[in-house]
């Protein structure tokens, strides 16, 4: 079996952590049990580009139990958990191509390795795999039945490809499932981002000014958790509706040029480029801490910070100190990459349980229905979204009401008024 991981001797520790995560992923476990009996993915190859974490490991196990031949590479050079990668290879015989801290050349070499397996279905996190597949392997792209995308950033890229008419196969935007973005993006990103910042810095949040750039679902989660820790939260936005929502939610709202003067902590969660840039670094206070929890390391203008610095050193693990000409110091966390995965362990398993259940069921849906789908981006089918929610409620021991026949009739009628 071909693979490329750091050290297979780490596998035993990785296995323990995979099993620990599985305990908090009851929905995916139920799907895996069904997949092992029905084999809905039998004979299909699935290449996945995802963060190599304990939760991802349980998704890979589920797909393999469903009969698929599975290959995994990392969607971020700093998010790979080397013990998990080793465990997948050693104990589950799943080929993994991922090493924490790999350089850009190795990252793309690993991407190409899973593409060259000629997959029938692809799973992506940020659209690097799918875009590389289209640019470098157009012939292989023609043979793909369909794919799934996990993130807001990736969905934006893939919708652009569809609009330009270059997308060669249908995509299911798993990110757009209610049981994904309302929970993973908000509660998962919120908790894990704060976790990453605290692990990296060991700083007190209470009483500090905490700037959140972007008030989408991820930004909402980060802002809520920072406030819960006692921080004074400032939100920056370009969307007037989201800015108004942030204000109504009780947060300070202002442009980044004003927030930059106040902030002790900064977190970008926009999916856009250079949200924090030179003019903002120029007015930040000494000791400002800057982090990213969007997808790529482009939200913070790191080249500008490098140019401004007269000295640079790693002062703590995942903390780089940039000393400016006037003596001020700015601290960049995790090289501007995903702080929740680089400095912590990513989202809790309980929330990834829903996201990855959507992935597994969407893979099954593509295999069954690919002939009916066009080359565009689709939402997760409502029946899958609701099935995941019901399974999660059952796992939590929660029951809900059902509409009566009278209520169903009322909702489908127009004649009854005041």
UniProtKB/Swiss-Prot annotation:
Cofactor: how and how many bound: Binds 1 NAD(+) per subunit.
Record keywords, A-Z: Cytoplasm, Hydrolase, NAD, One-carbon metabolism
Cofactor(s) needed by this chain: NAD(+)
Pathway: Amino-acid biosynthesis; L-homocysteine biosynthesis; L-homocysteine from S-adenosyl-L-homocysteine: step 1/1
Gene Ontology terms describing biological process: L-homocysteine biosynthetic process; one-carbon metabolic process; S-adenosylmethionine cycle
Catalytic reactions on record: S-adenosyl-L-homocysteine + H2O = L-homocysteine + adenosine
Molecular function GO terms recorded: adenosylhomocysteinase activity
Pfam families reported for this sequence: AdoHcyase (PF05221), AdoHcyase_NAD (PF00670)
Leading EC class: hydrolase
SMART domains per record: AdoHcyase, AdoHcyase_NAD
GO cellular component: cytosol
Entry EC number(s): 3.13.2.1
Binding site for substrate: 53, 125, 150, 180, 184
InterPro entries: Adenosylhomocyst_ase-like_sf (IPR042172), Adenosylhomocysteinase-like (IPR000043), Ado_hCys_hydrolase_NAD-bd (IPR015878), NAD(P)-bd_dom_sf (IPR036291), S-Ado-L-homoCys_hydrolase_CS (IPR020082)
Residues annotated for NAD(+) binding in this entry: 151-153, 185, 214-219, 237, 272, 293-295, 340
Location within or outside the cell: Cytoplasm
Family that this chain belongs to: Belongs to the adenosylhomocysteinase family.
Task performed by this protein: May play a key role in the regulation of the intracellular concentration of adenosylhomocysteine.
HAMAP family for the chain: AdoHcyase
Name of protein: Adenosylhomocysteinase
Annotated source species: Aquifex aeolicus (strain VF5)
């Amino acid at each position: 079996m071909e693979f490329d991981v750091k050290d297979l001797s780490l596998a035993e520790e990785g296995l323990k952590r995979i099993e620990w995560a599985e305990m908090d992923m009851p929905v995916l476990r139920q799907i895996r049990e069904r997949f092992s009996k029905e084999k809905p993915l039998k004979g299909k190859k699935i290449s996945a580009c995802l963060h190599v974490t304990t939760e991802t490991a349980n998704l890979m196990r589920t797909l393999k139990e469903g009969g698929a031949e599975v290959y995994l590479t990392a969607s971020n050079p700093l998010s790979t958990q080397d013990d998990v990668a080793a465990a997948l290879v050693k104990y589950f015989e799943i080929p993994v191509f991922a090493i924490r801290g790999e350089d850009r050349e190795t990252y793309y070499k690993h991407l190409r390795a899973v593409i060259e397996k000629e997959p029938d279905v692809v799973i992506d996190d940020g659209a690097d795999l799918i875009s590389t597949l289209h640019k470098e392997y157009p012939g292989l792209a023609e043979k793909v039945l369909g794919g799934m995308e996990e993130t807001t950033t990736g969905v934006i890229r893939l919708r652009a490809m569809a609009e330009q008419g270059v997308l060669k196969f249908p995509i299911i935007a798993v990110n757009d499932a209610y049981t994904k973005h309302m929970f993973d993006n908000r509660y998962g990103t919120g908790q894990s981002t704060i976790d990453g910042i605290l692990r990296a810095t060991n700083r007190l949040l209470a009483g500090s000014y905490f700037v959140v750039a972007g008030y989408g679902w991820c930004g909402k989660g980060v802002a809520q958790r920072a406030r819960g820790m006692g921080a004074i939260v400032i939100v920056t936005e370009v969307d007037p509706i989201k800015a108004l929502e942030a204000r109504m939610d009780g947060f300070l709202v202002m442009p980044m040029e004003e927030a930059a003067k106040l902030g002790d902590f900064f977190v970008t969660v926009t999916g856009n480029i250079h949200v924090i840039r030179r003019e903002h670094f120029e007015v930040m206070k000494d000791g400002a801490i800057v982090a990213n929890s969007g997808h790529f390391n482009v939200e913070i203008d790191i080249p500008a910070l490098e140019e401004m610095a007269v000295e640079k050193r790693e002062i703590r693990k995942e903390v780089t100190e940039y000393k400016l000409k006037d003596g001020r110091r700015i601290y960049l966390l995790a090289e501007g990459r995903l702080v929740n995965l680089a400095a912590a362990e990513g989202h809790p398993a309980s929330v990834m349980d829903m996201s990855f259940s959507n992935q597994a069921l969407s893979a099954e849906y593509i295999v069954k229905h690919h002939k009916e789908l066009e080359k565009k981006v689709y939402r997760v089918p409502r029946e899958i979204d609701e099935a995941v929610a019901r399974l999660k409620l059952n796992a939590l021991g929660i029951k809900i009401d059902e509409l009566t026949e009278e209520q169903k009739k009322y909702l489908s009628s127009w004649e009854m008024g005041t």
